[in-house]
């Protein structure tokens, strides 16, 4: 499946320490393998439907990754739970 990263995701991602960036990469990789049918649904991702096509996964204890699942996966935002809620209210 095709994917893209929005500017809102990139801006937040670049501000994360490298250790947290690595966890984000690992979570995205695990998600992509699941969506492509390479693995069963992973339990550690905390895959959660926000609304319609908007989904969230965990990247460690603090960070969440918000994405839209439609014809392609669009990664929208990375941040903590409260920041994701604020981002969704602004859309």
Predicted regions: what they are:
Residues 20-22, 26, 33, 64, ...:
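General N-terminal targeting signals
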Residues 30-58:
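A short, surface-exposed loop/turn module that caps and links secondary-structure elements
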Residues 1-29:
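Arg/Lys-rich, positively charged N-terminal/basic patches that mediate binding to nucleic acids
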């Amino acid at each position: 499946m095709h994917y893209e990263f929005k500017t809102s995701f990139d801006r937040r991602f670049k501000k994360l320490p490298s250790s947290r960036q690595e966890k984000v990469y690992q979570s995205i990789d695990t998600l992509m393998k699941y969506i492509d049918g390479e693995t069963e649904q992973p339990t550690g991702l905390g895959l959660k439907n926000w609304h319609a096509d908007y989904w969230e996964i965990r990247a460690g204890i603090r960070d969440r990754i918000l994405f839209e699942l439609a014809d392609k996966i669009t990664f929208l935002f990375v941040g903590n739970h409260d920041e994701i809620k604020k981002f969704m209210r602004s859309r």
